[in-house]
């Protein structure tokens, strides 16, 4: 698949286009220009490294939303085996914005749950753009309770702009469904490992993000509202989204500094969308480490540690400036 470049990557896009042009010429010519191609590839790599070393929070949010970024189902095929998808909330419907089911992780049974966006227009509509309705969260809840019943770990993958705000979702109890998940996840008697793989938007993300370990991919985001939404509320203009992104502290690095995130999983140069396989390997290693650490805890220790973790949120110290 040809890489789609973001606005701030235009200089990289120009170089890559030139490289592709030279490759095409070399295929149809006896002239050896591999040295020139190699030089440009090296230059493109260095340029990408320089640009990504100083991304702004707004630019990071654009990378987190990249249409070619790997989604939950991509990681399921790259990291897990024997995946068996489970459908429906047993109350209303099967929400396609959330996928989940039983799988094996290095041979060990686990329950995997995650948001799922779409690639093309048809799939985006089918997945409701990754915005779950109440039945999606109730499906996730059903699977988590099933995991607890069988004593297997839960791994969740968060990637949503937020819970669906439609009237039908509100009528079916959107806020109750989210709140119920928070309540139950806080007391699940099995390890829960949460990974923010793209956008972590508001309560729609939080509803499957309460756990023992919270990790974020390097260029993912996690916030109470989108930068555009924040700008529209505070300044009545979505054009100030870059300023809102900076103010809210939505990046993995910022959230780790605040103690809200346990681990940042490095992405390949240029973002996860550049190399799905490499990203999956990095994430698999992070999941292995987290599961190994949690597997050594008794149920009582697991719950006590989780409670202490949740109660630490929101604590901070103020220091007077003389």
From Swiss-Prot:
Main location: cytoplasm
Source superkingdom: Bacteria
GO CC field: acetyl-CoA carboxylase complex
GO molecular function, one term: carboxyl- or carbamoyltransferase activity
All residue ranges annotated as the CoA carboxyltransferase C-terminal domain in the record: 39-293
The keyword ATP-binding is assigned to this record: yes
Reaction catalyzed: N(6)-carboxybiotinyl-L-lysyl-[protein] + acetyl-CoA = N(6)-biotinyl-L-lysyl-[protein] + malonyl-CoA
Role: Component of the acetyl coenzyme A carboxylase (ACC) complex. First, biotin carboxylase catalyzes the carboxylation of biotin on its carrier protein (BCCP) and then the CO(2) group is transferred by the carboxyltransferase to acetyl-CoA to form malonyl-CoA.
Name the UniProt record assigns to this protein: Acetyl-coenzyme A carboxylase carboxyl transferase subunit alpha
Origin species: Dechloromonas aromatica (strain RCB)
The organism's taxonomic lineage, starting at the top: Bacteria, Pseudomonadati, Pseudomonadota, Betaproteobacteria, Rhodocyclales
């Amino acid at each position: 698949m040809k890489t789609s470049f973001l606005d701030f990557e235009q200089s990289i896009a120009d170089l890559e286009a030139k490289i592709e042009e030279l490759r095409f010429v070399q295929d149809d010519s006896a002239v050896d220009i591999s040295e020139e191609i190699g030089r440009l590839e090296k230059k493109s790599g260095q340029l990408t490294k320089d640009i990504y070393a100083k991304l702004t929070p707004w630019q990071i949010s654009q990378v987190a939303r990249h249409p070619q970024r790997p989604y939950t189902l991509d990681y399921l095929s790259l990291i897990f085996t024997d995946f068996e998808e489970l459908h429906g909330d047993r109350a209303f419907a099967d929400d396609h914005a959330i996928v989940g089911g039983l799988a094996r992780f290095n041979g060990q049974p686990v329950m995997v749950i995650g948001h799922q966006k779409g690639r093309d227009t048809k799939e985006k509509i089918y997945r409701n753009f990754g915005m779950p309705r109440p039945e999606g969260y109730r499906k996730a809840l059903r699977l988590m309770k099933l995991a607890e019943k069988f004593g297997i770990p839960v791994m969740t993958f968060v990637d949503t702009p937020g819970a669906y705000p439609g009237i039908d979702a509100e009528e079916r109890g959107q806020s109750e469904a989210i709140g119920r998940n928070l309540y139950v996840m806080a007391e699940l008697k099995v390890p829960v490992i949460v990974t923010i793989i793209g956008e972590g938007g508001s309560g729609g993300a939080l509803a499957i993000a309460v756990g023992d370990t919270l990790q974020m991919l390097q260029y993912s985001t996690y916030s109470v509202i989108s930068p555009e939404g924040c700008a529209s509320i505070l300044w009545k203009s979505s054009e100030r989204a870059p300023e809102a992104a900076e103010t809210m502290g939505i990046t993995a690095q910022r959230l780790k500094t605040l103690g809200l995130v346990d681990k940042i999983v490095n992405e390949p140069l240029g973002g996860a969308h550049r190399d799905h396989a490499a990203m999956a390997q990095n994430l698999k290693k992070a999941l292995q480490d987290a599961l190994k650490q949690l597997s050594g805890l008794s149920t009582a220790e697991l719950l006590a540690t989780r409670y202490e973790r949740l109660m630490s949120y929101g604590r901070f110290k103020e220091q007077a400036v003389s």
